[in-house]
Curated annotation (Swiss-Prot):
Subunit structure, as described in the record: Heterotetramer of two alpha and two beta chains arranged as a dimer of alpha/beta heterodimers.
One GO-annotated biological process of the protein: spermidine biosynthetic process
Catalytic reaction(s) noted: S-adenosyl-L-methionine + H(+) = S-adenosyl 3-(methylsulfanyl)propylamine + CO2
Protein name: S-adenosylmethionine decarboxylase proenzyme
Listed cofactors: pyruvate
Pathway: Amine and polyamine biosynthesis; S-adenosylmethioninamine biosynthesis; S-adenosylmethioninamine from S-adenosyl-L-methionine: step 1/1
Modified residues (Pyruvic acid (Ser)): S71
Keyword Lyase: yes
Enzyme kind, highest EC tier: lyase
Domain of life where this protein originates: Archaea
Amino acid sequence: MAGGVGGRVVVGRHVYGNLYGCDARVLGDEAALITIVKEAVRVANAMLLSIGSYRFGPNGGLTVFAVVAESHISIHTWPEHGFATVDVYTCGDHTDPKAAFDFIVEKLSPKKIEVFYGDRSMYSE
């Protein structure tokens, strides 16, 4: 049930946001972003299953994503605009998606951020 009535059966927490005014060089650096996402997995206390990336054209943005046992972490970049979106979704009480999100924000050094939170849990009736 929405609103947390009853006991929580499945724990799911989603932290996501928009980062403005990031350094275009970092947003275009595939190796750096992969390293950041791998470290964010550790910070979240999640278990890395796979990591991947995709560059959109020779001078385009990047998508870097980690599939973790608990769900996923992703960064999508638009270097030409100094803009990135970050998505950290984890399941389980042992994970800390907010810490992973904050770590990524620290590494991308945006001038402005918007952050959003979603409860993706299931509650017993």
